[in-house]
Amino acid sequence: MAIFELFSFDIDKLLVWVSKFSPGKILSAICRLGLDSWNNFRKWFWGLNFDKHEWAVDHFMPLMPRFSSDMDEVAKRIVTPKSKPKLEDCLEIDTAVEECFNEECFEPQEDGSMKLKRVAAPQQIKRVRTGMIEDAISAVEARIRNRHMIMGDDMGLVDEAAVRATAMDICGEYKINEHHTRCIIYAAAYRAMTPDQESIDATKMAYNPKSQARRDLVSILRKNISFGGFKSLEDFLSAPVSFPVEDAPYQILGIPEIKVADKRASRVCKFKRVVGLPSLSAGQSVCVHKTSLHNMIVSLEQRVFRVKNETGEFVVPPQPSKGAFDSISYFREAWKKKLYSKGPVVKSSIDDVVACYSSEKKKLYQKGAATLSHRPLHWRDSKVRAFIKVEKLECDKKAPVPRTIQPRSKRYNLCIGRYLRLNEKRMLDAIDAVFGEKTVLSGLDNKAQGRAIAKKWSKYESPIGIGLDASRFDQHCSKDALKFEHSFYRECFPDDKTSPDLLDWQLENEGSALMPTESLVKYRTRCRMSGDINTGLGNKILMCSMVHAYLKEVGVNASLANNGDDCVLFCEKGDFNRINDSLREWFLCRGFNMVVEEPVECLERVVFCRSQPVCVATKWAMVRQLGSLSRDCFSTQNWLNPTTFRDAMNALGQCNGIINDGVPVHMAQAKRMYAAGGNRKFDLKALHKQMEYSWRDRLGARTNLLWSEVEDSTRLSYFRAFGIEPAVQRIVEGYFSESKISEEGRQTNFLPTHYSRLHKDLLVPRYLN
């Protein structure tokens, strides 16, 4: 085989060799000649016209990856390449730049008051070390390649802008000075947009005729396979699929506070199956918990009676220190002053409370109101009747614990609702007045919330957003915390003789749950009941008052965005360490396990109520996180019924189309749902029927479907928020627009893990770090 000593290859020589030797022997002989010979052959082989020489693909393509891997190992043994410096190794402090940012803090005065003071803190701007600019550019280029899908001629201006934005974010992350930032952005970004040899080889491997032929063969085979009762995979993807609800995969702890007794009667279980629409889902796994004895006990154990400590053990929730809430009483007095500045607080009538509800819930409250006229309220009416909440939960990363709703009787709710239901908005406005700005953002549509959060962000020179994770807030609402909350209501009705009893009944809770298995679960507890009519209002009062007191105590000037237990603090970057060092311990003394999340320095990365700000056509709006693309494709309604399915698609398409007008990906999914619903005219009654609870808050006063064009600036903002680059956005939108939807659904015993054509890993937030 002396002919292999020639370092030049042509197709005729290869034909001669193949006629005499096997492909494996040929490649082995080339490898034995050394790395130069192998590299020359590999470069020549990948340059072949595979359409013209399919025989070369058949003989050598299956063997190329193995031999390439072997020769790479040989190269490593011959010479160990010098590791390239990391970006941080290429940088040093730029002493020529003396930029500072203003750090605000409160200082105690002799009279005991606190005075706001601004302190200049150095920015610590960096520059590239002498002679290391090429290494710095290479380091940034590598991070860009790992973050972006490098395209060919179809790469547009928006994609280029996204790559440059990534390079700029990297430079901003390391605080590189303006001059070197400009050099790195243009060099690294455009080098990364040029495919390297590895990218070219991988593309040839994936798209050569032989690989395409194999994919075609699989497509032919799929047409002859029955898929869970469907004719083909395409049939499965395009139709609604019904599968059973499930038990949570958790063991029962055996807590003595929970008792199970036999009962002759049993509760009728309404929700036994879930229906999903694979063709429009984003691929995340979604589960719904069934009403079962196992789920009820697990939920009570892990969401009411026990919490996990740092070692993963289940323990009793932390209790507040004695007198822990005394230092927050000033907030109640300030709140009361703001509340009464708008006039006295008036107790409502029973009929006014009933009028607050609609549909089936209104009928239930009308029945409860009728009984109050001849049978006075009794403490037994405050007993809790628990049930498993039917909700769509993402379960890719971790199996969620079932959620229990613990409401009291309609009679009790009507009586306490006379004090709180119609006064709730006014009480929340008083919280805003104490803070001096809009703080409680519930009740605002997504655009109003986006404007409010952007306004808070713009108040600071070097702003950061800090999420406060109040894990299982209701479970941590101790008896002392509830008493503190109730003191706000007592201040509003100091001479009333009924309200104290109604509030005291919330401190000692006796609950039960009737299960379909003819079992009765009984328990007693002293924490917040999630079904109480004042749960939302009470959580906002507690959280806002505690955060206000904490910020005042540590002397940090910060702005709060609140919606119950969802909290985000906005402040100067220099204040993060003080918050991070003290907040958890401060809240733990009051019985709450609060976690300070990592700060974000980009407005689009702020997470509030599972939504993030996106600049849509120059205006900020909150856009739901990517998991909503999957959750909206599942329902406990009977989507196997064509009429119900069309109504649901119409309602979802309308609502999401209005909320996400001009938003990448989200609007495309909504538009396809609306088309599946028949493109019917906007019907407020039909929408209200499908979305009884939150449609008004979501839509605000908007009722027109516009289907606005997605602007390039919006794609970039969406990219910063969710890490989905513009090219992928357009690919997914094209997929949604071409998806086929059938109304002829079927039942399956389970939903496959990868049930959607959009793989779950495609639409997940991807950030630089």
From Swiss-Prot:
UniProt superkingdom: Viruses
Enzyme Commission identifier(s): 2.7.7.48
Coiled coil: none
InterPro entries per record: DNA/RNA_pol_sf, Rev_trsase/Diguanyl_cyclase, RNA-dir_pol_PSvirus, RNA_pol_HCV
GO molecular-function terms, A-Z: nucleotide binding; RNA binding; RNA-directed RNA polymerase activity
This protein's UniProt keywords: Nucleotide-binding, Nucleotidyltransferase, RNA-directed RNA polymerase, Transferase, Viral RNA replication
Residue ranges occupied by any RdRp catalytic domain in the UniProt entry: 463-579
PROSITE patterns, sorted: RDRP_SSRNA_POS
Cited Pfam families: RdRP_3
One of the GO biological process terms: viral RNA genome replication
Catalytic activity: RNA(n) + a ribonucleoside 5'-triphosphate = RNA(n+1) + diphosphate
Family: Belongs to the tombusviridae RNA polymerase family.
Function as written in the Swiss-Prot or TrEMBL entry: Probable polymerase.
Full protein name: RNA-directed RNA polymerase
Organism from which the protein derives: Carnation ringspot virus (isolate Lommel) (CRSV)
Lineage: Viruses, Riboviria, Orthornavirae, Kitrinoviricota, Tolucaviricetes
